[in-house]
């Protein structure tokens, strides 16, 4: 079983992760991310936007099992995070989340 919080932290430290709904949507338009993570309590309009852009870009989506507050805590940030995009996983194995989902 993959520890999502640990792998997310490794990806942030060793790779490139874009944080925030607006920035994630921008990155999806360029097709840069390899994975998008969205909080389970994200509003329907936000989830639909992300799913639409991710489908166009061919990027998999992983729904974080916790709230946006918990996703922020997992990323070691002092604020809520509704969505984030993993552009470069670095040394983490975060892309394996898609295989297990």
UniProtKB/Swiss-Prot annotation:
Gene Ontology terms: cellular component: cytosolic large ribosomal subunit
GO molecular function, one term: structural constituent of ribosome
Domain of life of the organism encoding this protein: Archaea
Tagged with keyword Ribonucleoprotein: yes
Gene3D superfamilies membership: 3.30.1330.30
Protein's UniProt name: Large ribosomal subunit protein eL30
GO biological process, one term: translation
Entry similarity comment: Belongs to the eukaryotic ribosomal protein eL30 family.
Keyword field: Ribonucleoprotein, Ribosomal protein
């Amino acid at each position: 079983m993959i520890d999502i919080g640990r792998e997310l932290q490794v990806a942030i430290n060793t790779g490139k992760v874009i944080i925030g709904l607006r920035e994630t949507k921008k990155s999806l338009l360029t097709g840069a991310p390899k994975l998008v993570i969205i909080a389970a309590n994200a509003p329907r309009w936000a989830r639909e936007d992300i799913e639409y852009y991710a489908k166009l870009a061919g990027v998999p989506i992983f729904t974080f099992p916790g709230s946006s507050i918990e996703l922020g805590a997992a990323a070691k940030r002092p604020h809520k995070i509704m969505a984030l995009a993993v552009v470069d996983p670095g040394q983490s194995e975060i892309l394996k989340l898609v295989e297990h989902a």
